[in-house]
């Protein structure tokens, strides 16, 4: 559930394939894993690993017209440390399967669920989002905030469709252009980070072409980025660096995050996460 520009395109098996298949020397493999562990360390204690908000998740739930009194099965794919999974469990009569490929994040989720008295409603599953062990038409709702980019928007809505019951709801957030024209610096940055970034109309067309009926769409507001994600991350930079001995690699990660934050603050009128809500037709 991390922002694409955090270099967290890792919810599938990509990181492991990269480590195993690239022509690394053994020492380079170790360095890659060390870098990965630093990223986990930066994010694992956060409430969120990407832009979002409880009010916005509840808005999506309302727009999806999910009956709060009916027992449901929900899969939250790319759940991170569980902000959305726990909200769904709290608000609904639902059994939530919270999926992430990072056990560190799931450990945090399980601790939060226990403290909130929700352990009986949330089951964690550590696996890749492109190798989900679900049955056909197993779920009433598939939910994924800030994570579908890991395997690509089109692949995600296409592959996950079979897990949804007919008439079930897909709720996903995806990085989205808000303007027709963008500064070249921003365009180049995102084309490098996530080439599938596109306008809402293009994303909605993809859902329609893959057997969904669009129900609603809205844009995450600025506070979901700044107040709920970036500012808490910034508050943790000093402790993160201290934990990791102010190493060059840790400092490089912090600098990359600062660059990303500055880019958003400069160009926030041009992009955000869009929340896409659609019903499975067939």
Positions of PLM-derived features:
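Conserved alpha-helix/loop element of class I SAM-dependent methyltransferases that forms part
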Residues: 50-70
């Amino acid at each position: 559930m991390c922002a694409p520009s955090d270099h967290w395109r890792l919810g599938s098996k990509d990181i492991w394939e990269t480590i195993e298949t690239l022509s690394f020397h053994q020492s380079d493999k170790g360095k890659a894993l060390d870098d990965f562990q630093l990223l986990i360390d930066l994010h694992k204690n956060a409430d969120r690993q990407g832009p979002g908000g409880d009010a916005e998740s509840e808005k999506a739930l309302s727009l999806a017209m999910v009956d709060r009194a009916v027992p449901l099965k929900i899969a939250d794919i790319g759940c991170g440390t569980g902000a959305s999974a726990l909200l769904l469990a709290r608000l609904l009569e639902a059994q939530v399967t919270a999926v992430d490929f990072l056990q560190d994040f799931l450990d945090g989720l399980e601790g939060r669920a226990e403290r909130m008295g929700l352990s009986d409603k949330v089951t964690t599953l550590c696996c890749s989002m492109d190798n989900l062990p679900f049955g056909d038409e197993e779920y009433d709702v598939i939910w994924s905030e800030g994570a579908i980019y890991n395997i690509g928007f089109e692949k995600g809505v296409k592959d996950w469709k079979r897990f949804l019951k007919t008439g079930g709801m897909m709720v996903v957030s995806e990085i989205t252009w808000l303007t027709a024209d963008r500064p070249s610096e921003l365009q180049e940055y995102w084309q490098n980070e996530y080439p599938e970034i596109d306008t809402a109309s293009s994303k909605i067309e993809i859902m329609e072409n893959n057997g969904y009926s669009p129900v609603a769409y809205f844009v995450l507001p600025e506070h979901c980025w700044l107040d709920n994600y970036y500012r808490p991350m910034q508050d943790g930079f000093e402790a993160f660096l201290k934990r990791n001995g102010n190493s060059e690699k840790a400092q490089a990660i912090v600098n990359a995050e600062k660059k990303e934050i500055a880019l958003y603050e400069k160009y926030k009128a041009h992009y955000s996460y869009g929340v896409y809500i659609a019903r499975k037709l067939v």
